[in-house]
Regions:
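Hydrophobic aliphatic residues
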Residues: 74, 104, 181, 193-194, ...
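C-terminal substrate-binding subdomain of Rossmann-fold SDR/epimerase-dehydratase oxidoreductases
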Residues: 52, 194-276
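Residues in well-ordered alpha-helical elements
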Residues: 68, 80, 87, 98, ...
Length: 276
């Protein structure tokens, strides 16, 4: 049994992950500021601590509890917010991460699992499916901070010997996904279809994404939590894309969901968004 801290564990993916750690017998603490997470998402059996990852008390918690594993899902993940307020994005995604990393280093945490994003760190890659070794060309401050987080993890590994792994998610969907935010097009489209409302597509809808089910993402997290690796020589040695390798256009996704919901397809097209 391991003692596991899941940051962002009241959110969409983090709460499923907290469930999974509990089910396999781990002791789980969920840390979340509830800005986007929901208290009811925290599974029974997990201890809940309401804190922001930038708060000094989050670091104190890590030093006091001596976790075996930290799975870091808390983040500012709205691309549009990162474009309009890059300082805030960096404050959460870099300053918050460093608060945890310094405490983890001092507490000698065994494994740090970091959530990155394959959807933003590569930019518009030429090769698809995109390998982990592809050039990193983020096109938004959010992508920059996610890639920066990976570099910080690699630094702590190289200099301090911290064991870590980075998961570069594609577009995750599934139960508990927020249908009201900027991310989560599957949940957004599904909710609007069931309400009989039109779908808004930004751009021409021919842009493609890789959509992966949250249960598969959880399975990847568990496998990589337990995996052992040789000492890393480069950034991509400890980074893993998590997706299906299948491209789906936004237009095709809208049509598929409309068919599954047995609703008419009514799409309104809007200008493409910056950083998306």
């Amino acid at each position: 049994m391991s003692r596991v801290l899941v940051t962002g564990g009241a959110g969409f993916i983090g709460s499923h992950l907290a469930d999974a750690y509990l089910q396999r017998g781990d002791e789980v603490v969920v840390l979340d500021n509830l800005v986007h997470g929901r208290r009811e998402n925290v599974p029974a059996g997990a201890e809940f601590v309401e804190l922001d990852i930038r708060d000094a008390r989050a670091g104190d918690l890590i030093r006091e509890r001596r976790f075996d594993v930290i799975n870091h899902h808390a983040a500012q993940m709205d691309v549009r917010v990162s474009v309009t307020d890059p300082r805030f994005d960096a404050s959460v995604n870099l300053d918050g991460l460093l608060n945890l990393l310094e405490a983890a280093r001092e507490a000698k945490v065994r494994k740090f699992v970091f959530v990155s994003s394959g959807g933003v760190v590569y930019g518009e890659p030429e090769q698809r499916p995109t390998p982990e070794s592809a050039p990193k060309q983020p096109e938004s401050p959010y992508g920059v901070t996610k890639l920066g987080g990976e570099y910080y993890l690699h630094y702590y590994h190289r200099v301090h010997g911290m064991d870590y792994v980075a998961l570069r998610y594609s577009n995750v969907y599934g139960p508990r996904q927020d249908p009201h935010g900027e991310a989560g097009v599957v949940a957004i489209f599904s909710t609007r279809l069931l309400r009989g409302e039109p779908l808004t597509v930004f751009g021409d809808g021919e842009q493609t994404r890789d959509y992966v089910y949250v249960g598969d993402v959880v399975a990847a997290n568990l496998a990589l939590t337990d995996a052992t690796f040789p000492r890393s020589a480069g950034l991509d040695d400890r980074a893993f894309n998590v997706g299906t390798g299948i491209e789906t256009s936004v237009n095709d996704l809208a049509a598929t969901l409309a068919s599954a919901a047995e609703r008419p397809l009514d799409v309104h097209y809007a200008p493409a968004r910056a950083g998306a």
